[in-house]
Regions:
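Feature for intrinsically disordered/low-complexity regulatory segments and propeptides
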Residues: 2-202, 210
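Intrinsic disorder/low-complexity polar-acidic segments
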Residues: 1, 191-277
Length: 277
């Protein structure tokens, strides 16, 4: 399925057009001229592709099921940063024919309501760019600043493209639920992948085995992070707290509980963090 792109800057020369065709760009004649187009990648997704997606979980198993389902469709791959290009999505120029193309169009409607951007890699097809990927993409282009969030998408795309042309190293792309969700550094000291299903399964196993009693309270997920909260009871907790209170001349008469919150992210919005309270 093809979509036009909004082209900023000078129009490509004939020689540049031939090179772009080899890279996957398409030039379609329309009334009054022609449009530069890209074929969209039919990225696998479930029902959680919306950039403003969020979900709460009442059961611990639901968190694990969600993470496994998302990870099953997700992919990671590396691209030289200087080969990345960003464009504002234009019009769909073909009617979707397959189920995958119809889903791709639904995802594109959401993209146009949020980032409005496409990401061209060294592949011939373009990916839709999730809003969560913009901060890491700006990092690959080595630019930052509050003003970037205020400019029009086509202008932001051109700024990014000019900077990406001189970018160094490789980028590690996280593709999930219909879109690119992050553009990490793939360098030696860059982003380290810790699959979220493993992080939260290890947390569940540890908490269940380490404490006398644990109760899952709630979980939460959106396109930037996942969190889960447990309440715990343990005699060691009571002993330590009791000793502290005795130093201040007080006694602990009630049953003590504490909460553990685990948060993590695969788009660099958070590390793998543990909070006690």
């Amino acid at each position: 399925m093809q979509t036009s792109i909004l082209w900023e800057g000078s129009l490509p020369s004939k020689e540049e057009m031939e090179k772009m065709k080899q890279e996957g760009y398409l030039f379609r004649a329309v009334e009054g001229g022609w449009k530069i187009c890209l074929k969209l990648h039919n990225t696998p997704t479930g029902t959680w592709y919306a950039d403003n997606f969020s979900k709460s979980f009442l059961k611990e198993v639901e968190v694990h099921q969600y993470l496994e389902e998302v990870e099953k469709r997700a992919t990671w791959f590396e691209v030289p940063s200087k080969e990345l290009r960003v464009y504002e999505a234009g019009q769909i120029l073909e009617k979707p024919e397959s189920k995958e193309e119809r889903i791709c169009m639904e995802v594109l409607r959401d993209t146009k309501n949020h980032s409005r951007l496409l990401l061209k890699t060294n592949q011939t097809e373009a990916y839709q760019l999730g809003s969560s990927a913009i901060p890491t993409l700006e990092s690959r282009a080595r630019i930052s600043g509050a003003a970037l969030s205020s400019v029009e998408p086509a202008v932001l795309a051109e700024i990014l493209n000019q900077c990406l042309k001189v970018a160094k190293g490789k980028a590690l792309l996280r593709v999930s639920e219909g879109k690119v969700r992050a553009v990490h550094s793939a360098e030696k000291n860059g982003y380290q992948v810790y699959p979220l299903p493993e992080v939260f399964m290890l947390a569940s196993v540890y908490i269940r085995g380490e404490y006398k009693k644990s109760t899952f309270l709630e979980g939460y997920a959106d396109q930037t992070m996942v969190s889960a909260i447990w309440q715990i009871e343990d005699h060691r907790l009571e002993e330590v707290y009791g000793e502290i209170m005795e130093k201040y001349g007080k006694q602990v008469k009630e049953k003590l509980t504490a909460t553990i919150r685990i948060t993590s992210s695969d788009v660099a919005a958070s590390g793998a963090n543990i909070f006690y309270s």
